[in-house]
């Protein structure tokens, strides 16, 4: 199966985790697009969606799925999103689509995070995929230097990208993230950092992993 076919497979499988009558949290990215397309088939059974990005909002609305403002929702039963990497404990690197801050906000509302990914995203230790960090523009160089000093990482500004919040993305390479929760906690305290793309506090409860043999369900 191709990577696109694996994404479609887990996108379809994730629909089973959406309770009838609920508001569902929707992430961002190519795998999530497959979930949105599958969600359209049951749009009459749900109350709507809360979206983590402008791109996802536009796709949801184009398919006739109501999108609610975050202020209208106190809790949601499930948040469905992809990952750039996921480790054996359900910790993730996210933010390849530059929507990490809003993704983390929506994930914080959810009772359960269901990650959808193809098998290539499963790793033993995170850090091979560049770690995205949303930063206030004036702090980009300062935060980049700090990554080098603290972790030996090389941080570069992602060219041509401005987040939905008007900020920049640093992509940090050369990391070995043995303790995701500790790194997430520390980096989020650095001045100028809006959000780091480590999801350890908001880790996955379930991962639907697309494999050539079908969907593999990992519970954390």
From Swiss-Prot:
Subunit composition and interactions? Homodimer.
Q: Which family is annotated?
A: Belongs to the ribose 5-phosphate isomerase family.
Pull one GO CC term from this UniProt entry: cytosol
Read off the InterPro entries from this record: NagB/RpiA_transferase-like, Ribose5P_isomerase_typA_subgr, Ribose5P_isomerase_type_A
Name under which the protein is recorded: Ribose-5-phosphate isomerase A
Q: Quote the record's binding site residues for substrate.
A: 28-31, 81-84, 94-97, 121
PANTHER family reported for this sequence: RIBOSE-5-PHOSPHATE ISOMERASE
CDD domains listed in its UniProt record = RPI_A (cd01398)
Keywords from the named record:
Isomerase
What function does this protein fulfil? Catalyzes the reversible conversion of ribose-5-phosphate to ribulose 5-phosphate.
List GO BP terms, alphabetically: D-ribose metabolic process; pentose-phosphate shunt, non-oxidative branch
Pfam families, alphabetically? Rib_5-P_isom_A
- The positions flagged as active site in the entry are 103 (proton acceptor)
Gene name? rpiA
Q: In which pathway does it act?
A: Carbohydrate degradation; pentose phosphate pathway; D-ribose 5-phosphate from D-ribulose 5-phosphate (non-oxidative stage): step 1/1
Q: Which SUPFAM superfamilies match?
A: D-ribose-5-phosphate isomerase (RpiA), lid domain, NagB/RpiA/CoA transferase-like
> GO: which molecular function terms?
ribose-5-phosphate isomerase activity
Check the record and name the HAMAP family matching this protein.
Rib_5P_isom_A
Root EC class:
isomerase
Task: Give the EC number(s) listed in the UniProt record.
Answer: 5.3.1.6
Which species? Leptothrix cholodnii (strain ATCC 51168 / LMG 8142 / SP-6) (Leptothrix discophora (strain SP-6))
Q: Which reaction does this chain catalyze? A: aldehydo-D-ribose 5-phosphate = D-ribulose 5-phosphate
């Amino acid at each position: 199966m191709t990577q696109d076919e694996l994404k479609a497979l887990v996108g379809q499988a994730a629909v089973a985790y959406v309770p009838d009558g609920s508001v569902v949290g929707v992430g961002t990215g190519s795998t999530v697009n497959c979930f949105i397309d599958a969600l359209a088939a049951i749009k009459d059974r749900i109350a709507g969606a809360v979206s983590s990005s402008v791109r996802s909002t536009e796709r949801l609305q184009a398919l006739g799925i109501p999108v609610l403002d975050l202020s209208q929702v106190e809790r949601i039963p499930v948040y469905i999103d992809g990952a750039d990497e996921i480790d054996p404990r359900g910790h993730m690197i996210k933010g390849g689509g530059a929507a990490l801050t809003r993704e983390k906000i929506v994930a914080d509302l959810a009772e359960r995070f269901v990650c959808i990914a193809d098998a290539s995203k499963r790793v033993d230790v995170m850090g091979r995929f560049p770690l995205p960090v949303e930063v206030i523009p004036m702090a980009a160089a300062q935060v980049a230097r700090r990554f080098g000093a603290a972790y030996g990482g090389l941080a570069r500004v992602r060219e041509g990208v401005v987040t939905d919040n008007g900020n920049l993305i640093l992509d940090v390479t050369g990391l070995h993230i043995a303790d995701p929760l500790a790194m997430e906690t520390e980096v989020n305290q650095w001045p100028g950092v809006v959000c780091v793309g480590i999801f350890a506090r908001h880790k996955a409860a379930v991962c639907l992993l697309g494999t050539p043999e079908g969907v593999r369900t990992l519970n954390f």
